[in-house]
Protein backbone atom coordinates (compact mmCIF):
# COMPACT_ATOMS: atom_id res chain seq x y z
CA UNK A 1 0.00 0.00 0.00
CA UNK A 2 1.00 3.68 -0.16
CA UNK A 3 1.26 4.08 3.63
CA UNK A 4 3.10 0.85 4.42
CA UNK A 5 6.09 0.08 2.24
CA UNK A 6 6.73 -3.12 4.16
CA UNK A 7 3.86 -5.60 4.52
CA UNK A 8 2.87 -6.11 8.15
CA UNK A 9 -0.18 -8.35 7.94
CA UNK A 10 -0.66 -11.89 6.68
CA UNK A 11 -4.18 -12.92 5.67
CA UNK A 12 -5.21 -16.55 5.50
CA UNK A 13 -8.47 -17.70 3.90
CA UNK A 14 -10.16 -20.90 2.80
CA UNK A 15 -13.14 -21.89 0.70
CA UNK A 16 -16.60 -22.11 2.16
CA UNK A 17 -17.86 -25.67 2.73
CA UNK A 18 -20.63 -25.30 0.11
CA UNK A 19 -18.47 -23.82 -2.62
CA UNK A 20 -16.78 -27.11 -3.53
CA UNK A 21 -18.62 -30.01 -5.09
CA UNK A 22 -18.37 -33.39 -3.44
CA UNK A 23 -17.25 -35.08 -6.65
CA UNK A 24 -14.54 -32.52 -7.32
CA UNK A 25 -11.13 -33.52 -5.99
CA UNK A 26 -9.55 -31.32 -3.33
CA UNK A 27 -6.40 -30.32 -5.26
CA UNK A 28 -8.49 -29.26 -8.26
CA UNK A 29 -10.67 -26.99 -6.12
CA UNK A 30 -7.60 -25.35 -4.59
CA UNK A 31 -5.99 -24.60 -7.95
CA UNK A 32 -9.06 -23.23 -9.63
CA UNK A 33 -9.93 -19.57 -9.26
CA UNK A 34 -12.79 -19.29 -6.75
CA UNK A 35 -15.13 -16.29 -6.73
CA UNK A 36 -14.63 -13.66 -4.05
CA UNK A 37 -17.89 -14.39 -2.25
CA UNK A 38 -16.81 -18.00 -1.62
CA UNK A 39 -13.66 -17.13 0.40
CA UNK A 40 -13.72 -16.96 4.20
CA UNK A 41 -11.01 -15.18 6.19
CA UNK A 42 -9.72 -17.49 8.88
CA UNK A 43 -6.62 -15.74 10.23
CA UNK A 44 -5.40 -12.18 10.57
CA UNK A 45 -1.73 -12.52 11.51
CA UNK A 46 0.56 -9.53 12.02
CA UNK A 47 3.96 -10.41 10.62
CA UNK A 48 5.58 -9.23 13.85
CA UNK A 49 4.11 -12.30 15.53
CA UNK A 50 5.09 -14.65 12.70
CA UNK A 51 8.52 -15.91 11.74
CA UNK A 52 8.85 -16.77 8.05
CA UNK A 53 11.70 -18.84 6.66
CA UNK A 54 12.55 -20.99 3.64
CA UNK A 55 12.22 -24.62 4.64
CA UNK A 56 13.01 -26.30 1.29
CA UNK A 57 14.14 -24.11 -1.61
CA UNK A 58 14.21 -26.96 -4.11
CA UNK A 59 10.57 -27.84 -3.54
CA UNK A 60 9.62 -24.19 -2.89
CA UNK A 61 8.36 -24.87 0.59
CA UNK A 62 8.08 -22.17 3.29
CA UNK A 63 7.89 -22.43 7.08
CA UNK A 64 5.55 -20.31 9.22
CA UNK A 65 6.26 -20.30 12.98
CA UNK A 66 3.82 -18.64 15.38
CA UNK A 67 4.57 -17.01 18.72
CA UNK A 68 3.09 -19.99 20.55
CA UNK A 69 5.81 -22.20 19.04
CA UNK A 70 3.60 -24.06 16.62
CA UNK A 71 5.00 -24.33 13.07
CA UNK A 72 3.32 -24.84 9.69
CA UNK A 73 4.70 -25.52 6.22
CA UNK A 74 3.36 -23.85 3.07
CA UNK A 75 3.76 -25.27 -0.42
CA UNK A 76 3.41 -22.98 -3.44
CA UNK A 77 0.69 -24.23 -5.75
CA UNK A 78 0.69 -22.24 -8.98
CA UNK A 79 1.49 -22.62 -12.63
CA UNK A 80 5.01 -23.45 -13.78
CA UNK A 81 5.52 -20.08 -15.41
CA UNK A 82 4.80 -18.21 -12.20
CA UNK A 83 6.42 -20.47 -9.62
CA UNK A 84 9.92 -19.03 -9.85
CA UNK A 85 8.69 -15.44 -9.79
CA UNK A 86 6.36 -16.00 -6.85
CA UNK A 87 8.96 -17.91 -4.85
CA UNK A 88 11.59 -15.20 -5.44
CA UNK A 89 9.12 -12.61 -4.13
CA UNK A 90 8.63 -14.65 -0.97
CA UNK A 91 12.40 -14.97 -0.47
CA UNK A 92 12.86 -11.20 -0.85
CA UNK A 93 10.02 -10.57 1.60
CA UNK A 94 11.53 -12.93 4.17
CA UNK A 95 14.94 -11.23 3.99
CA UNK A 96 13.33 -7.78 4.32
CA UNK A 97 11.33 -8.81 7.38
CA UNK A 98 14.43 -10.28 9.02
CA UNK A 99 16.32 -7.02 8.50
CA UNK A 100 13.54 -5.00 10.10
CA UNK A 101 13.47 -7.30 13.11
CA UNK A 102 17.25 -6.94 13.53
CA UNK A 103 16.95 -3.13 13.48
CA UNK A 104 14.23 -3.16 16.11
CA UNK A 105 16.28 -5.40 18.40
CA UNK A 106 19.30 -3.07 18.17
CA UNK A 107 17.32 0.10 18.94
CA UNK A 108 15.74 -1.12 22.16
CA UNK A 109 16.68 -3.79 24.69
CA UNK A 110 13.09 -4.13 25.73
CA UNK A 111 11.34 -7.19 24.44
CA UNK A 112 9.89 -6.76 20.97
CA UNK A 113 6.63 -8.27 22.16
CA UNK A 114 5.78 -5.37 24.51
CA UNK A 115 6.78 -2.74 21.92
CA UNK A 116 4.59 -4.24 19.24
CA UNK A 117 1.53 -4.52 21.46
CA UNK A 118 1.77 -0.79 22.26
CA UNK A 119 1.87 0.23 18.57
CA UNK A 120 -0.27 -2.40 16.84
CA UNK A 121 -3.92 -3.18 17.37
CA UNK A 122 -4.60 -6.89 17.24
CA UNK A 123 -8.14 -7.90 16.42
CA UNK A 124 -9.74 -10.99 17.79
CA UNK A 125 -9.03 -14.05 15.72
CA UNK A 126 -12.23 -15.79 16.68
CA UNK A 127 -14.28 -13.57 14.38
CA UNK A 128 -14.86 -15.12 10.96
CA UNK A 129 -15.45 -12.59 8.21
CA UNK A 130 -16.80 -13.08 4.70
CA UNK A 131 -14.84 -11.13 2.12
CA UNK A 132 -17.09 -10.00 -0.70
CA UNK A 133 -14.56 -7.94 -2.59
CA UNK A 134 -11.42 -10.03 -2.59
CA UNK A 135 -9.94 -9.17 -5.99
CA UNK A 136 -6.23 -9.49 -5.28
CA UNK A 137 -6.11 -13.23 -5.84
CA UNK A 138 -3.93 -14.37 -8.70
CA UNK A 139 -5.57 -16.72 -11.15
CA UNK A 140 -3.74 -20.05 -10.94
CA UNK A 141 -3.47 -22.31 -13.92
CA UNK A 142 -3.55 -26.06 -14.03
CA UNK A 143 -0.13 -27.54 -14.60
CA UNK A 144 0.05 -31.13 -15.78
CA UNK A 145 3.61 -31.84 -14.64
CA UNK A 146 2.85 -31.12 -11.00
CA UNK A 147 -0.22 -32.80 -9.62
CA UNK A 148 -1.22 -34.35 -6.31
CA UNK A 149 2.26 -33.97 -4.85
CA UNK A 150 1.48 -30.30 -4.20
CA UNK A 151 -1.75 -31.15 -2.46
CA UNK A 152 0.02 -33.58 -0.19
CA UNK A 153 2.17 -30.83 1.29
CA UNK A 154 -0.56 -28.19 1.37
CA UNK A 155 -2.22 -27.16 4.63
CA UNK A 156 -5.71 -26.48 5.79
CA UNK A 157 -5.62 -22.96 7.22
CA UNK A 158 -8.69 -23.56 9.31
CA UNK A 159 -6.50 -25.50 11.76
CA UNK A 160 -4.47 -22.47 12.77
CA UNK A 161 -4.46 -21.67 16.45
CA UNK A 162 -6.27 -18.55 17.63
CA UNK A 163 -4.28 -15.44 18.48
CA UNK A 164 -5.15 -14.05 21.89
CA UNK A 165 -4.89 -10.44 23.01
CA UNK A 166 -1.45 -9.49 24.32
CA UNK A 167 -1.13 -7.00 27.14
CA UNK A 168 1.82 -4.84 28.10
CA UNK A 169 4.72 -6.54 29.83
CA UNK A 170 5.81 -4.91 33.07
CA UNK A 171 9.22 -5.32 34.63
CA UNK A 172 9.22 -7.34 37.82
CA UNK A 173 11.99 -7.09 40.43
CA UNK A 174 14.16 -10.16 40.39
CA UNK A 175 15.34 -11.97 43.48
CA UNK A 176 13.27 -9.76 45.74
CA UNK A 177 12.66 -11.52 49.02
CA UNK A 178 10.53 -9.78 51.66
CA UNK A 179 12.28 -9.27 54.94
CA UNK A 180 10.87 -11.52 57.61
CA UNK A 181 11.52 -10.56 61.24
CA UNK A 182 13.32 -13.08 63.38
CA UNK A 183 11.00 -15.21 65.47
CA UNK A 184 12.17 -15.48 69.05
CA UNK A 185 10.76 -18.31 71.10
CA UNK A 186 11.77 -18.91 74.71
CA UNK A 187 10.19 -21.79 76.58
CA UNK A 188 11.21 -22.33 80.18
CA UNK A 189 9.95 -25.02 82.54
CA UNK A 190 11.18 -24.78 86.14
CA UNK A 191 10.45 -27.11 89.05
CA UNK A 192 11.94 -26.04 92.41
CA UNK A 193 11.59 -27.62 95.82
CA UNK A 194 12.55 -25.27 98.69
CA UNK A 195 14.00 -26.58 101.97
CA UNK A 196 12.24 -25.78 105.28
CA UNK A 197 13.67 -25.66 108.81
CA UNK A 198 13.09 -28.77 110.94
CA UNK A 199 12.95 -28.50 114.77
CA UNK A 200 14.46 -31.89 115.49
CA UNK A 201 17.64 -31.08 113.45
CA UNK A 202 16.96 -33.75 110.84
CA UNK A 203 18.53 -33.78 107.40
CA UNK A 204 17.68 -30.69 105.37
CA UNK A 205 16.51 -31.23 101.80
CA UNK A 206 18.65 -29.42 99.27
CA UNK A 207 17.14 -27.00 96.77
CA UNK A 208 17.04 -28.74 93.41
CA UNK A 209 15.64 -27.64 90.08
CA UNK A 210 15.22 -28.92 86.57
CA UNK A 211 15.32 -26.23 83.88
CA UNK A 212 14.79 -26.80 80.16
CA UNK A 213 15.44 -23.67 78.12
CA UNK A 214 15.12 -23.27 74.35
CA UNK A 215 16.88 -20.03 73.47
CA UNK A 216 17.92 -18.08 70.41
CA UNK A 217 21.40 -16.60 70.15
CA UNK A 218 20.21 -13.04 70.66
CA UNK A 219 18.64 -13.85 74.07
CA UNK A 220 21.61 -15.63 75.62
CA UNK A 221 23.22 -12.38 76.78
CA UNK A 222 20.09 -11.16 78.54
CA UNK A 223 19.70 -14.48 80.32
CA UNK A 224 23.34 -14.42 81.45
CA UNK A 225 22.95 -10.90 82.87
CA UNK A 226 19.87 -11.95 84.84
CA UNK A 227 21.69 -14.99 86.20
CA UNK A 228 24.65 -12.83 87.33
CA UNK A 229 22.28 -10.53 89.22
CA UNK A 230 20.65 -13.47 91.00
CA UNK A 231 23.91 -15.15 92.01
CA UNK A 232 24.16 -13.51 95.46
CA UNK A 233 20.43 -13.56 96.25
CA UNK A 234 18.99 -16.43 98.35
CA UNK A 235 15.37 -17.44 98.06
CA UNK A 236 13.27 -17.17 101.29
CA UNK A 237 12.88 -20.45 103.17
CA UNK A 238 16.03 -21.97 101.68
CA UNK A 239 18.84 -22.74 104.21
CA UNK A 240 21.54 -22.76 101.59
CA UNK A 241 24.59 -20.47 101.65
CA UNK A 242 26.39 -18.92 98.69
CA UNK A 243 29.08 -21.58 98.69
CA UNK A 244 26.68 -24.52 98.35
CA UNK A 245 24.71 -22.61 95.72
CA UNK A 246 27.80 -22.03 93.60
CA UNK A 247 28.68 -25.72 93.93
CA UNK A 248 25.25 -26.70 92.65
CA UNK A 249 25.64 -24.37 89.67
CA UNK A 250 29.02 -25.85 88.82
CA UNK A 251 27.43 -29.30 88.61
CA UNK A 252 25.07 -28.25 85.78
CA UNK A 253 25.46 -29.97 82.42
CA UNK A 254 25.09 -28.29 78.98
CA UNK A 255 24.32 -30.10 75.74
CA UNK A 256 24.22 -27.90 72.63
CA UNK A 257 22.41 -29.01 69.44
CA UNK A 258 22.77 -26.24 66.80
CA UNK A 259 20.83 -23.27 68.29
CA UNK A 260 19.11 -25.21 71.12
CA UNK A 261 20.64 -25.36 74.61
CA UNK A 262 19.44 -27.84 77.21
CA UNK A 263 20.40 -26.94 80.79
CA UNK A 264 20.04 -29.49 83.57
CA UNK A 265 20.54 -28.24 87.13
CA UNK A 266 20.42 -30.08 90.42
CA UNK A 267 20.27 -33.78 91.12
CA UNK A 268 17.70 -34.71 88.48
CA UNK A 269 18.72 -35.57 84.94
CA UNK A 270 16.89 -36.49 81.75
CA UNK A 271 17.65 -39.91 80.30
CA UNK A 272 19.04 -39.10 76.83
CA UNK A 273 21.44 -40.74 74.41
CA UNK A 274 23.44 -37.53 73.95
CA UNK A 275 24.83 -36.97 77.47
CA UNK A 276 26.31 -39.47 79.94
CA UNK A 277 23.91 -39.60 82.90
CA UNK A 278 25.23 -40.11 86.40
CA UNK A 279 23.31 -42.38 88.70
CA UNK A 280 20.94 -40.62 91.07
CA UNK A 281 22.15 -42.63 94.03
CA UNK A 282 25.79 -41.49 93.62
CA UNK A 283 24.87 -37.83 93.29
CA UNK A 284 22.53 -37.98 96.30
CA UNK A 285 25.25 -39.63 98.41
CA UNK A 286 27.77 -36.94 97.47
CA UNK A 287 25.37 -34.15 98.39
CA UNK A 288 24.45 -35.86 101.69
CA UNK A 289 28.13 -36.29 102.58
CA UNK A 290 28.79 -32.60 101.97
CA UNK A 291 25.84 -31.47 104.05
CA UNK A 292 26.64 -33.96 106.85
CA UNK A 293 30.26 -32.75 107.02
CA UNK A 294 29.09 -29.16 107.29
CA UNK A 295 26.41 -29.87 109.90
CA UNK A 296 28.19 -32.42 112.20
CA UNK A 297 30.02 -29.81 114.33
CA UNK A 298 26.74 -27.93 114.82
CA UNK A 299 24.94 -31.12 115.88
CA UNK A 300 27.73 -32.00 118.37
CA UNK A 301 27.69 -28.55 119.94
CA UNK A 302 23.88 -28.60 120.30
CA UNK A 303 24.03 -32.08 121.86
CA UNK A 304 26.62 -30.94 124.44
CA UNK A 305 24.54 -27.90 125.34
CA UNK A 306 21.44 -30.08 125.77
CA UNK A 307 23.30 -32.48 128.11
CA UNK A 308 24.68 -29.61 130.21
CA UNK A 309 21.23 -28.05 130.57
CA UNK A 310 19.78 -31.41 131.63
CA UNK A 311 22.51 -31.95 134.24
CA UNK A 312 21.94 -28.48 135.66
CA UNK A 313 18.23 -29.15 135.92
CA UNK A 314 18.75 -32.47 137.74
CA UNK A 315 21.19 -30.86 140.19
CA UNK A 316 18.79 -28.03 140.92
CA UNK A 317 15.97 -30.53 141.47
CA UNK A 318 18.01 -32.65 143.90
CA UNK A 319 19.12 -29.61 145.90
CA UNK A 320 15.52 -28.40 146.16
CA UNK A 321 14.35 -31.79 147.40
CA UNK A 322 17.00 -31.88 150.14
CA UNK A 323 15.96 -28.45 151.38
CA UNK A 324 12.35 -29.50 151.56
CA UNK A 325 13.24 -32.68 153.48
CA UNK A 326 15.20 -30.64 156.02
CA UNK A 327 12.28 -28.24 156.52
CA UNK A 328 9.88 -31.16 157.03
CA UNK A 329 12.19 -32.73 159.65
CA UNK A 330 12.50 -29.42 161.50
CA UNK A 331 8.70 -29.06 161.62
CA UNK A 332 8.31 -32.60 162.94
CA UNK A 333 10.82 -32.02 165.71
CA UNK A 334 9.08 -28.80 166.76
CA UNK A 335 5.72 -30.55 166.95
CA UNK A 336 7.17 -33.37 169.02
CA UNK A 337 8.73 -30.90 171.43
CA UNK A 338 5.45 -29.03 171.87
CA UNK A 339 3.60 -32.25 172.44
CA UNK A 340 6.09 -33.34 175.08
CA UNK A 341 6.05 -29.98 176.91
CA UNK A 342 2.28 -29.67 177.19
CA UNK A 343 1.64 -32.57 179.70
CA UNK A 344 4.34 -31.27 182.07
CA UNK A 345 2.76 -27.84 182.19
CA UNK A 346 -0.75 -29.23 182.66
Swiss-Prot record:
Location within or outside the cell: Cell projection, Cilium, Flagellum
GO biological process, one term: flagellated sperm motility
Principal location: other
UniProt keyword Transport, yes or no: no
Compositional bias segments (type: Basic and acidic residues): 283-297, 334-346
Region (Disordered): 275-346
InterPro entries xref list: GARIL-like_Rab2B-bd
Subunit structure: Interacts with CALM1.
Function, as annotated: Seems to play a role in sperm motility.
Family label: Belongs to the GARIN family.
UniProt name for this protein: Golgi-associated RAB2 interactor protein 2
Organismal lineage: Eukaryota, Metazoa, Chordata, Craniata, Vertebrata
Name of encoding gene: GARIN2
Amino acid sequence: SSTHKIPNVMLLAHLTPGSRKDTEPLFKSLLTSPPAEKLVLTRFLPLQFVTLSVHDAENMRLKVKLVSGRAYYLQLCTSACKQDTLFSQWVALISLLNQEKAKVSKVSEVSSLSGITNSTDVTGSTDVMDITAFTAILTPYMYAGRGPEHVRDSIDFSEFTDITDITDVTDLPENEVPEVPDIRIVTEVIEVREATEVTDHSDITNCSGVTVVFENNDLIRAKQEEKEKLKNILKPGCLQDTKSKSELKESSKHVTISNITLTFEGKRYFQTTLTPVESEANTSKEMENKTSEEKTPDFQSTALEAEESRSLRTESNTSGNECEERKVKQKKTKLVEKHVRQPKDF
